[in-house]
Amino acid sequence: MNIIALPAFSDNYIWLLHDGRRALVVDPGDAQPVLKALQSTGLDLEAILVTHHHPDHTAGVSELREATGATVWGPAREAIPEPFIPLHDGDTVTALGVAWSVLDVPGHTAGHIAFWASDIDGAPLLFCGDTLFSVSYTHLRAHETVLDL
């Protein structure tokens, strides 16, 4: 599994994971960096994972879905661009052949979720959006969830 950090805005990253043929992105606040990366690599976007509703994590979702037909998964308790598959704590999403566990990590937003895979090429991987964000209100329960991993 390959992971690429795509810079977005002045201080964000959009995470692109791929297996050499298929890709998924996490929290695409801007479609353009993702579309450029897909074009330059020839990858097919199959999945979009969203951790919370803030525009710097969702503004590119609709354009990417329309351009690629990718399936969108996001937190059930947040306003994610429709259509998307709503997720709750304990759900599992399979994308790129990986089972991603959904963790409820409220704090930065009330419905914030994280995506956890216990074994990506022998190592765990967590996409927690802005759960661990130094300049924002956070909630200790969310941190406890992440620490328990």
Predicted regions mapped to residue ranges:
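Conserved G/P- and acidic residue-centered "switch" motifs that form tight phosphate/ATP-binding loops
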Residues: 52, 108, 130
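Internal catalytic or translocation cores that form aromatic/hydrophobic pockets or channels
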Residues: 127, 132-133, 137
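Short active-site segment of divalent metal-dependent hydrolases/proteases
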Residues: 55, 59, 111, 133-134
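Ligand/cofactor pocket segment of small-molecule handling proteins
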Residues: 104, 111-114
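Extreme N-terminal starter segment of soluble prokaryotic enzymes
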Residues: 1-3
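Conserved small/polar residues in nucleotide/adenosyl-binding loops
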Residues: 138-145
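Active-site HxH/HxHxD metal-binding segment of metal-dependent hydrolases
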Residues: 9-10, 23, 28-104, 118-119, ...
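Short beta-strand scaffold segments in enzyme catalytic cores
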Residues: 14-16, 113-115
